[in-house]
């Protein structure tokens, strides 16, 4: 097995730019463009919320399926062929094409179909760029690369929404800007970053596949690991409930004009992101020093729950700002310390990468379920109060489920996975 050499600043810079483009084109439509595109008149605004939940739901499902499939196919590239670059370029181009299609689409079905194409493209390119971390970086640089992915997520949503709002772009022009961004930066980064040909190694035998399947079942049977997964899933649903419908809440819950609501959405996103980053850094340091990740993870869910209570009790923009800060604090701490806690609980060191992938899928599933559930709750009561109450309750339930997982007596000193944290989801 060849020894991986450290990469330089150029590699890290290009890699970070690639992820900045990916996060920007993925999160800007979710938070701003799709809600504006699917928004309906005040007399029938609930149908717009339901349509948005539907579109985000089917898009998220497509992405969850496409990412692992694309990753597995790129792993199986023929001997001597490039494994990651073709998929990264193909995903970037597919994303750009369907962003344009989405911009010209009208109605929930057409927009939903086009958005599925976008999420598949994003998932394919994300899988390819993520694989570069394991392919090309030594263990001493993987944490830095993962931190670059996470920080670019935080910057990406602010950058995307900020460009559209501050430049005064319409919905279609916003999509065209995003398409150009991913086409240029995504493909450019894929061409610049090295992609060594697939090594000459025999394919895994069928028996190994069977053993992997058995070990997967064993991971789910591990008591503490299973409780942690359930807690992570439910907490992420609570986070998605509290953040996915922010623009609709400003428009129809607080009855703000569209231009004012867009400006205020940008402000909420900046506040949320600032506190996510702050909490991530501080709690990461504290958890490394104390080792008591379980307690910190549970406390984070309590802070997240408080944000839902604030909006439900005091539905004003000022209270929403406070709630965004609390949500950022809670989820920033949960996403960082929660994954470090998950790393402590991984059942078998032979399956760390696979089991950590399962942990990350639970976060993605939560962000998929949240908008759909939120749209249903809005339709049920004709308002937003139940959405935020449910966000608070689910956050508390997530903390209770996490509490059922026992803190290991001696946390491993060799796992640097707390740096590979599941980064904050979009507000």
Q: Language-model segments: which ranges?
A:
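Juxtamembrane intracellular "pre-TM" segments in multi-pass secondary transporters
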Residues: 1-9, 196-230, 419, 423-427
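Helix-loop boundary and gating motifs at the non-cytosolic
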Residues: 2-60, 226-262
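Helix-to-loop junctions at the C-terminal end of transmembrane segments
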Residues: 66-81, 279-292
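Structural signature of the two symmetry-related core transmembrane helices
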Residues: 84-100, 295-310
């Amino acid at each position: 097995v060849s020894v991986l050499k450290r990469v330089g600043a150029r590699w890290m810079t290009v890699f970070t730019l690639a992820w900045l483009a990916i996060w920007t084109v993925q999160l800007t439509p979710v938070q701003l463009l799709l809600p504006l595109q699917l928004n309906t008149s005040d007399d029938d605004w609930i149908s717009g919320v339901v349509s948005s939940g539907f579109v985000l739901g089917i898009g998220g499902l497509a992405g969850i399926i496409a990412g692992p499939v694309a990753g597995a196919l790129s792993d199986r590239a023929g001997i001597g062929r490039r494994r990651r670059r073709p998929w990264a370029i193909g995903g970037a181009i597919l994303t750009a094409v369907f962003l344009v299609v989405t911009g010209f689409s009208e109605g929930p079905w057409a927009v939903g179909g086009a958005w599925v194409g976008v999420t598949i493209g994003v998932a394919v390119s994300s899988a390819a760029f993520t694989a570069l971390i394991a392919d090309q970086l030594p263990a001493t640089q993987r944490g830095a690369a993962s931190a670059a992915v996470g920080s670019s997520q935080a910057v990406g949503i602010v950058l995307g929404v900020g460009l559209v709002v501050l430049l005064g772009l319409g919905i279609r022009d916003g999509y065209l800007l995003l398409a150009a961004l991913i086409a240029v930066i995504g493909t450019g980064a894929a061409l610049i970053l090295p992609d060594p040909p697939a090594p000459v190694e025999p394919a895994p035998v069928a028996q190994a596949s069977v053993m992997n399947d058995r070990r997967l079942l064993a991971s789910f049977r591990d008591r503490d690991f299973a409780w942690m997964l359930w807690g992570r899933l439910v907490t992420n649903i609570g986070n998605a409930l509290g953040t996915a419908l922010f623009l609709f809440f400003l428009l129809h819950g607080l009855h703000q004009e569209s231009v004012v609501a867009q400006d205020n959405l940008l402000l909420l996103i900046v506040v949320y992101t600032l506190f996510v980053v702050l909490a991530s850094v501080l709690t990461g340091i504290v958890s490394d020093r104390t080792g008591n990740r379980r307690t910190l993870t549970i406390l984070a869910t309590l802070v997240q729950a408080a944000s839902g209570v604030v909006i439900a009790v005091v539905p004003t923009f000022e209270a929403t700002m406070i709630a965004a800060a609390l949500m950022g604090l809670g989820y920033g701490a949960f996403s960082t310390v929660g994954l470090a806690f998950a790393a402590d609980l991984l059942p078998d060191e032979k399956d760390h990468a696979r089991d950590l992938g399962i942990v990350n899928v639970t976060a993605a599933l939560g962000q998929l379920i949240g908008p759909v559930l939120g749209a249903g709750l809005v339709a049920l009561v004709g308002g937003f109060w139940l959405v935020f109450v449910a966000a608070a309750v689910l956050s508390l339930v997530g903390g209770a489920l996490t509490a059922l997982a026992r803190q290991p007596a001696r946390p491993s000193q060799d796992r640097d996975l707390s740096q590979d944290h599941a980064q904050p989801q979009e507000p």
